[in-house]
């Protein structure tokens, strides 16, 4: 695998640090008035999700992580693992709860949601849900006319169990588009 020097560090770069695959979140080059220049780097451990801050002297290098991002369709959850299938090779893969993190609240079974799965040595480290998903509202209060003093929103439970804030005019059994990155309601979807 390639080696990356401190002058090649940038956000999004995947490197090995202390035997763990990490992604660089932030990189700041510091040149003090006296002494050697260094890089102050924030790393996210791809296995645990923990963020650590580390300094590297100029000229130091880190080994690149053998991490691959692949697009796969979500199939189902068997209670312990979430199962995915590659759309072209039909190869199946299973991810555990640690790899799923927040993505599990946005995926419905056999919904053909195309997820990005980060693999390290063939093992899923993280699953990223599609940016937007369309889900049906299974439970919400009816919007009462004139009840808008608090901003005009109400909670709604989606078919996957996730709860989002929706406008008062949205009713139960309607399909809405949700931004999975923020968890915000975007629009109603006509069927």
Curated annotation (Swiss-Prot):
The UniProt entry lists the main location of this chain as cytoplasm
- What SUPFAM superfamilies does the entry give? Nucleic acid-binding proteins, Translation proteins SH3-like domain
Regarding protein family, the annotation reads: Belongs to the elongation factor P family.
PANTHER family, per database record: ELONGATION FACTOR P, ELONGATION FACTOR P (EF-P) FAMILY PROTEIN
Q: What does this protein do?
A: Involved in peptide bond synthesis. Alleviates ribosome stalling that occurs when 3 or more consecutive Pro residues or the sequence PPG is present in a protein, possibly by augmenting the peptidyl transferase activity of the ribosome. Modification of Lys-34 is required for alleviation.
**Gene Ontology biological process terms, A to Z:** peptide biosynthetic process
- Judging by the UniProt lineage, the source's domain of life is Bacteria
For this entry, the protein name equals: Elongation factor P
């Amino acid at each position: 695998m390639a080696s990356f020097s401190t002058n090649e560090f940038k956000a999004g770069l995947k490197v090995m640090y202390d035997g763990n695959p990490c992604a660089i979140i932030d990189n700041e080059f510091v040149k003090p008035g006296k002494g050697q220049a260094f890089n102050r780097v924030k790393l996210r451990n791809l296995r645990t999700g923990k963020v650590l801050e580390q300094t590297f002297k100029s000229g130091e290098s880190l080994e690149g992580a053998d991490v691959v991002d692949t697009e796969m369709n979500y199939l189902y959850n068997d209670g312990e693992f979430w199962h995915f299938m590659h759309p072209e090779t039909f190869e199946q893969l299973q991810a555990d709860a640690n790899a799923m993190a927040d993505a599990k609240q946005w995926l419905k079974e056999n919904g053909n949601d195309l997820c990005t799965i980060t693999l390290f040595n063939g093992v899923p480290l993280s699953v990223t849900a599609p940016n937007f998903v369309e889900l049906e509202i299974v439970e919400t209060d009816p919007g009462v006319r004139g009840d808008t003093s608090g901003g005009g929103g109400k909670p709604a439970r989606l078919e996957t169990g996730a709860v989002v804030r929706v406008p008062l005019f949205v009713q139960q059994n309607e399909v809405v588009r949700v931004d999975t990155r923020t968890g915000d309601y975007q629009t109603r979807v006509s069927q």
